[in-house]
């Protein structure tokens, strides 16, 4: 079978080695004669999986000891509600920075629970989409927390700055599409959350990192399944967790550690992004409308000079083993999502195709 490279924004490509191991263990896991999907989440065998996954995740991100790691349901959208329900306390407002589609979605959900102070960070610089630097973000004095999304998958916009708003500002961030792709200083955040389906594992699992002093403040109306304290007190097993997604994510963590960890992923991701953006920038046939300072290394949207060729580009790229390149309906064009599991070889195959397609149709 020809090599297939999956550029889907999520659920996304998983490491080939991880899929191979999961395939080998599917019907007889851990010598039990059953699948990991069939064992009790409270049995000692799966408890070991859960504990190892948390330890490896903590190691990869150097999570400080005063932070709890929760393995949850609900995805990023679940956390759009969970953050205000857990962190507001007796306050009625929170700061929300709007830099794209997912930040705006979080704001919409937050309005059910508080009065968000929304700061629109989107700007245009020399005709390109960009984000105002953090020093220009206008925060309020009475906010319970400040929320932002460091990587906008649809817009192809990234905010790579590290928050530095002082110890009194609780920073909550949606890292769904950039978690584990580069080092981050967890201590600068109060809450970090990430859906698994991009850089962690299969859809169905969400990981939350929460500073322990923020526990115990949940609104009385907060559903128990979203209550950080309840999840923490029950070892993320208040109800039956998505065990297979948890297991597979644990395999991904071990794969990351075996391949140099987050620091090495950071280097490779930079190489992949430079290669792809380089082809786009050196061409009049392709274009990307995001300012270089805010370009995402995970999600690269691009347009063809002649949109009439979009359908042909997608058909021929798919036939060449380059899958899921269609852009999101909101922005159109193409989008290549190049998360950790996408090898440099895959991006090279894409850029070779792009160069050849331009030669034939430019």
Swiss-Prot record:
Its EC number is 2.6.1.52. Pathway: Amino-acid biosynthesis; L-serine biosynthesis; L-serine from 3-phospho-D-glycerate: step 2/3; Cofactor biosynthesis; pyridoxine 5'-phosphate biosynthesis; pyridoxine 5'-phosphate from D-erythrose 4-phosphate: step 3/5. GO terms for molecular function: O-phospho-L-serine:2-oxoglutarate aminotransferase activity; pyridoxal phosphate binding. It comes from the Bacteria. It holds the Pfam family Aminotran_5. HAMAP family: SerC_aminotrans_5 (MF_00160). It comes from Escherichia coli O17:K52:H18 (strain UMN026 / ExPEC). It is an enzyme of class 2 (transferase). L-glutamate binds at residues 9, 42. Pyridoxal 5'-phosphate binds at residues 76-77, 102, 153, 174, 197, 239-240. Keywords: Amino-acid biosynthesis, Aminotransferase, Cytoplasm, Pyridoxal phosphate, Pyridoxine biosynthesis, Serine biosynthesis, Transferase. This is Phosphoserine aminotransferase. The modification N6-(pyridoxal phosphate)lysine is found at residue 198. Binds 1 pyridoxal phosphate per subunit. Its cofactor is pyridoxal 5'-phosphate. GO terms for biological process: L-serine biosynthetic process; pyridoxine biosynthetic process. Belongs to the class-V pyridoxal-phosphate-dependent aminotransferase family. SerC subfamily. It is found in: Cytoplasm. Catalyzes the reversible conversion of 3-phosphohydroxypyruvate to phosphoserine and of 3-hydroxy-2-oxo-4-phosphonooxybutanoate to phosphohydroxythreonine. NCBIfam families: PRK05355.1, serC_1.
């Amino acid at each position: 079978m020809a090599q297939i490279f999956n550029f889907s924004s999520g659920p996304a490509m998983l490491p080939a080695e991880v899929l191979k191991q999961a395939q080998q263990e599917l019907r007889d896991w851990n010598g039990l004669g059953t699948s990991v999907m069939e064992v009790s989440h409270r049995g000692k065998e799966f408890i070991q999986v859960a504990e190892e996954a948390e330890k490896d995740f903590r190691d990869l991100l150097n999570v400080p000891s005063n932070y709890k790691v929760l393995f949850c349901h609900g995805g990023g959208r679940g956390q759009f509600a969970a953050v205000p329900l857990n962190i507001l306390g007796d306050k009625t407002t929170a700061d929300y920075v709007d830099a794209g589609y997912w930040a705006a979605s979080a704001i919409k959900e937050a309005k059910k629970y508080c009065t968000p102070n929304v700061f629109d960070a989107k700007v245009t610089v020399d005709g390109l989409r960009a984000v105002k630097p953090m020093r220009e973000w206008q925060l309020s004095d009475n906010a319970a927390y400040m929320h932002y999304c460091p990587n906008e998958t649809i817009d192809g916009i990234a905010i790579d700055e590290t928050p530095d708003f002082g110890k009194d500002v609780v920073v909550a961030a949606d890292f769904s599409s950039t978690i584990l792709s580069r080092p981050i200083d967890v201590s600068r955040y109060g809450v970090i959350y990430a859906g698994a389906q991009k850089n962690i594992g299969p859809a169905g699992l969400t990981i939350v990192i929460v500073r322990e002093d923020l526990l115990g403040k949940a609104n009385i109306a907060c559903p128990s399944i979203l209550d950080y304290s309840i999840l923490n007190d029950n070892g993320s097993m208040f109800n039956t967790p998505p065990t297979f997604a948890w297991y597979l994510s644990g395999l991904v963590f071990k794969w990351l550690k075996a391949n140099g960890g987050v620091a090495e992923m950071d280097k490779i991701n930079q190489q992949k992004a430079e290669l792809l953006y380089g082809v786009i920038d050196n061409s009049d046939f392709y274009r990307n409308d995001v300012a270089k300072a805010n370009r995402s290394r995970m999600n690269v949207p691009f347009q063809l000079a002649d949109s009439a060729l979009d359908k042909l580009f997608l058909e021929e790229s798919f036939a060449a083993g380059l899958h899921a390149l269609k852009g999101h309906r909101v922005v159109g064009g193409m989008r290549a999502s190049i998360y950790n599991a996408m090898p440099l070889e895959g991006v090279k195959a894409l850029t070779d195709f792009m160069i050849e397609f331009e030669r034939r149709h430019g």
